[in-house]
Amino acid sequence: MLVAEAAERNKEPILQVLRQYLDSAQRGVRVLEVASGSGQHIAHFARAFPHAEWQPSDVDQRCLDSILATTQAHGLPNVKAPMYLDVTWDWKQWGGILPQSLDLLVCINMSHISPLSCTEGLFRAAGHLLKPKAVLITYGAYAINGKISPQSNVDFDLTLRCRNPEWGLRDTSLLKDLGQASGLLLERMVDMPANNKCLIFRKQ
């Protein structure tokens, strides 16, 4: 199993945000996590929401193996087998997920370590797959209307762009525009530890 220190640190703060948008007692809730990574997040969330159905996904086979091992180790029957998913694919290729069938779509720490086409694909698919009034929640470090702060995030952005010119912190104004193009409105930005944010986009 892969273990990411950052995921251990942020899984509980992110869960506290999710609690504001999911009812732990409600049955039949369907959640897709894009770019699930090690599986630590979805295992933590699935324990907190045992009546929801959680679908993890990733494009990296090592992550898919780790997700399976992590969820099996925790004995989580409400987590489906991890799905291979390239987020740039057309939404109709997203594992047979039906249009307007998801109650929540979660994406943690993907947009800044992937080409912009991945973030564009995420918003396009969310516009089709989320139920009306359902939400897309993204988490990470972002530029806010053209400005990156504090200095640690400026340095982080530079490090990412040195590793891959297609990577880097995405601007919330760009994400707002991508959301609107897919019928998603940026409803809220939540300050998180370590200069990160959760962005809440609601499907109209």
Swiss-Prot record:
Residues bearing the modification Phosphoserine: S149
Pfam families (alphabetical): DUF938 (PF06080)
Keywords: Acetylation, Phosphoprotein
UniProt entry tagged with the keyword Transcription: no
Membrane-spanning intervals of the chain: none
Protein name listed in UniProt: Methyltransferase-like 26
Modified residues (N-acetylmethionine): M1
Keyword set includes Methyltransferase: no
Family membership noted in the UniProt record: Belongs to the UPF0585 family.
Recorded superkingdom: Eukaryota
Gene3D superfamilies per the UniProt record, alphabetical: Vaccinia Virus protein VP39
InterPro entries (alphabetical): DUF938, SAM-dependent_MTases_sf
